[in-house]
Amino acid sequence: MSTATLSKEQREELLKALKERFEKNRKRHEGLEWTDLHARLVRKSRALWSLSEMERTGGEPDVIGKDRGTGQYVFCDCSAESPQGRRNVCYDRAGQEKREKEGLRLAGNVLDMAAAMGIEPLTEEQYRELQKLGSFDTKTQSWLKSPAEITKLGGAIFGDRRFGRVFVYHNTAPCFYRGRGFRGSLTIQE
């Protein structure tokens, strides 16, 4: 993960956007207070940088919960569609290299992009939980963190919402589409 930091202006702009989104979407985090979250965020420069990367790439990150046991806040990309700045990617580096050898141009791969941003791709379980908070990916698709038993065979999974239902599918890891990106999560430690 990059050790990049934000300027004071960038931090203030990001915190303002996060607060506005927090206030506008209270159903995503009932019982949580912005003042508590803000106090934690201002002490976490790496987390702020990761959130700024989520924001910069179109993810519209918002807090979706707080672990009662650990006190950790969980942020997730809450953009209506898969983040625009993270589409046209295959699942992993091997898939990316295969496609590039074929002369195809793509934006990168999920695993490397997520690591560079300091976030984790959503798991299938997290994706289904997110979909309980609204209708996401009704026109796009999002790669999901894929189980080892699938990736070792060259596959990966992705999800979307169609016909009022959430679907999870499989594809080969080298596949990439203009309308398929990935959503990430970030846990803010105590």
Region spans (language model):
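A binding-site-centric feature that preferentially detects glycan-recognition modules on secreted/surface proteins
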Residues: 2-120, 124-190
